[in-house]
């Protein structure tokens, strides 16, 4: 089944919904970083949140970066997304292992930790990016984003993010949704939506059963005039390039470049997001040095 993100409304626009199946892109990210099951679940939840939230950006050059680090053994996760539903991410320690939690599930909250902040950074092409932050609520990620939307953006929200890791470490199912009540929605509607969300099986169960994201949302919002606005296929996509890495290397300054050149060895730089290796020979470093002197 292809991954898909859809945006929708219910009850004449009183409820705003972004939902998606992200199994393939989470599998891609997990493979790139060689994640353990709990690392795959944590990274996958963040990637899913990123691609869902990224679709709310208006322009192609706008970017959304999400960061969470609660002091746990996962050592933090960062993801970056764009409005075309592309997303990339990395986890500080992809080899983290934890015992199952008291519910018999992967202990994502324990791996992330609670002693830290969740950051939402929106680069909208202005002089300064918008930076929102909240204390980590549970480390389970979905609850943390629900807390962020409610506290930082004053939008009561329900967030579900799920990743089901198979025995062979591939991703069996991944997906999620963000449901937000508009300011003029009445309390009875909010109570009904909350009740529905509490009664449904985990989203990974529904995906594993072969249900599409449309079927899942129609199941949740039955009788609420679900209106699907648009859809897009999300992708794990890194936009690194040799040119960008070269610019970053040049920016470290003439003295540091001279030290690398004097060392007489090739310099290898690895992209955090996709593990692509870029090698710069002493000749390459020499050219960068000469360019820096010209400037």
From Swiss-Prot:
It is found in: Cytoplasm. It comes from Clostridium botulinum (strain Eklund 17B / Type B). Disulfide bonds join 238-240, 271-274. Redox regulated molecular chaperone. Protects both thermally unfolding and oxidatively damaged proteins from irreversible aggregation. Plays an important role in the bacterial defense system toward oxidative stress. GO terms for molecular function: protein folding chaperone; unfolded protein binding. It comes from the Bacteria. GO terms for biological process: protein refolding. Its main location: cytoplasm. InterPro entries: Heat_shock_Hsp33 (IPR000397), Heat_shock_Hsp33_C (IPR016154), Heat_shock_Hsp33_N (IPR016153). This is 33 kDa chaperonin. Belongs to the HSP33 family.
